[in-house]
Amino acid sequence: MNLLLTLLTNTTLALLLVFIAFWLPQLNVYAEKTSPYECGFDPMGSARLPFSMKFFLVAITFLLFDLEIALLLPLPWAIQSNNLNTMLTMALFLISLLAASLAYEWTQEGLEWAE
């Protein structure tokens, strides 16, 4: 009986708080609350702003290099493993892949911001 009373009280209190949370904001409707705010930009303007493709390519390149660096982070703990040759081979492979990727991006001028 005590458990049933506790569950009923908690459920009633939770439902009461939910109803108050939905009902209370509708009492005071202001123009500022009903209009969208987009960080100081005019929300009623054009939604199709020009997007820099160079910025997109630099951002994707950053994400790829960041992922490769994240793969290198556990290497100090991998040194403590039993198979040191495998760990060193994988580390050398990841570092050479990172260097080759950077060299390719550099030769293709993917990191150049100004044209």
Swiss-Prot record:
What is the designated name of this protein?
NADH-ubiquinone oxidoreductase chain 3
- Please give an example of a GO cellular component term from this record: mitochondrial inner membrane
Q: GO biological process: any one?
A: mitochondrial electron transport, NADH to ubiquinone
The free-text function statement in the UniProt record for this protein reads: Core subunit of the mitochondrial membrane respiratory chain NADH dehydrogenase (Complex I) which catalyzes electron transfer from NADH through the respiratory chain, using ubiquinone as an electron acceptor. Essential for the catalytic activity of complex I.
Query: Keywords on this record?
Result: Electron transport, Membrane, Mitochondrion, Mitochondrion inner membrane, NAD, Respiratory chain, Translocase, Transmembrane, Transmembrane helix, Transport, Ubiquinone
* Subcellular compartments: Mitochondrion inner membrane
What reaction gets catalysed by this protein? a ubiquinone + NADH + 5 H(+)(in) = a ubiquinol + NAD(+) + 4 H(+)(out)
Q: Which organism is it from?
A: Balaenoptera musculus
Q: Which residues cross the membrane?
A: 3-23, 55-75, 84-104
Q: Family per UniProt?
A: Belongs to the complex I subunit 3 family.
Q: Which domain of life is it from?
A: Eukaryota
